[in-house]
Amino acid sequence: MSPRRAQAVLGTDGDPAAALREHLVDTAEALLAERQVNTITTRDIARAANVSDGVLYNYFADKSELLLTALVRRFTELVERLRTELPDPGSGTVDANLRLVAGALYDLHAAAFPIVGSLLAEPALLHRFMAAIHSTDEPLGGRQIRDTVVAYVVAEQKRGRLARADPGAAADLLIGATATLVFTGHLGEGRDPVERLPAVVDTLIRGLAPQRRKR
């Protein structure tokens, strides 16, 4: 037994089955980072994981289920990273915080774009992926991302640091603008999209700045 196989079987929690399943998901995720989803075969995954082809079917119904598990896990990690990167309401300045929010959203879209892009060649798997991340039990898609940004805006509004504008609209503007910048960046249009983030935030801030009372 090779060291790699032994490590996968033994794991850290003493459960060989769980450890091997995790090893298969890790392997699939690594392959997805290097190749298009429609080029990955069951044999490719098995060879990379150093197991026989049939082992995959002890844990997953088929190759698509394994790839879907890896894709959803990766996207879950991206959403969780977004949540940890957002600033605490009331800290620093609103201008600086919104720039951090925009930057975090841009990074999320930039990392997620290749995932969704690779799935365009596999419509059935794309449909399953979208259903999984928007499931009612554990929404990980646009709703959770939007709710996270809305919560930050509302918290700043309660502190009087942002005007009482529609927080959902503010979140939509930030999410939509950063997604567009990532998309146009992949098309190679215009200057570096990251350089355009400050202008997006400045425009939003002008609409959200608290109105000063006239004396």
Predicted regions mapped to residue ranges:
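C-terminal peripheral helix-coil segments that are non-catalytic and often amphipathic
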Residues: M1-A8, L100, D107, R143, ...
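Helix-turn-helix
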Residues: H23, L31-E65, T69, R73
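Short amphipathic alpha-helical elements of helix-turn-helix/winged-helix folds
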Residues: T27-L31, T69, A104, A177
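Amphipathic alpha-helical linker/stalk segments
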Residues: V72-V101
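Amphipathic alpha-helical packing segments from all-alpha helical-bundle domains
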Residues: A96, A110, P114-S118, L126-R159, ...
